[in-house]
Design a protein with these regions (language model features):
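Short helix-capping segments at alpha-helix termini
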Residues: 29-33, 79-80
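Acidic, metal-coordinating helix/loop segments flanking the phosphotransfer/catalytic sites
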Residues: 25, 29-31, 39-57
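Short, flexible hinge/linker loops that cap or flank conserved catalytic cores
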Residues: 3-6, 78
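Basic, polyanion-interacting recognition surfaces, primarily
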Residues: 1-2, 19
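Switch/coupling loops of ABC transporter nucleotide-binding domains
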Residues: 9, 35, 82
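CheY-like receiver
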Residues: 47-104
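Conserved beta-strand positions in the Rossmann-like core of class I SAM-dependent methyltransferases
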Residues: 12, 37-38
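Conserved acidic segment of CheY-like receiver
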Residues: 7-19, 24, 28
């Protein structure tokens, strides 16, 4: 369940590459509005965390093992998905994310 405003935002960082996850986490730790940071290293773990913990914000790698970022959204359901920031180094993945209703 999302944290109350007094506890700060609960943020999920889902990326299969540990250095990429750590860079995002380091940036989030500087923000006083962020309370809890949860990590996932694959898409299946991301789905389970989203369904069970209901984070307020998700940083989601497009290309991960077990489930891609787009498959995570499809499995959770776009209407139940928290605000999501797609993380990708590939233009092709960004295009597919926008086709899945991601915002620029």
């Amino acid at each position: 369940m999302p944290l109350s405003a007094s506890e700060g935002l609960c943020v999920l960082v889902a990326d299969d590459e540990a250095p990429a996850r750590q860079r995002i986490i380091d940036l989030l730790r500087r923000d006083s509005q962020v309370g809890a940071i949860i990590e996932a290293s694959d898409g299946l773990s991301a789905v389970e965390i989203i369904q069970n913990r209901r984070p307020d914000l998700v940083f989601l790698d497009v290309q991960m093992p077990e489930r891609t970022g787009l498959e995570v959204i499809a499995e959770v359901g776009a209407e139940r998905m928290p605000l999501t920031v797609f993380v990708t180094a590939y233009d092709e993945h960004a295009i597919r994310a926008f086709e899945a209703n991601a915002l620029d």
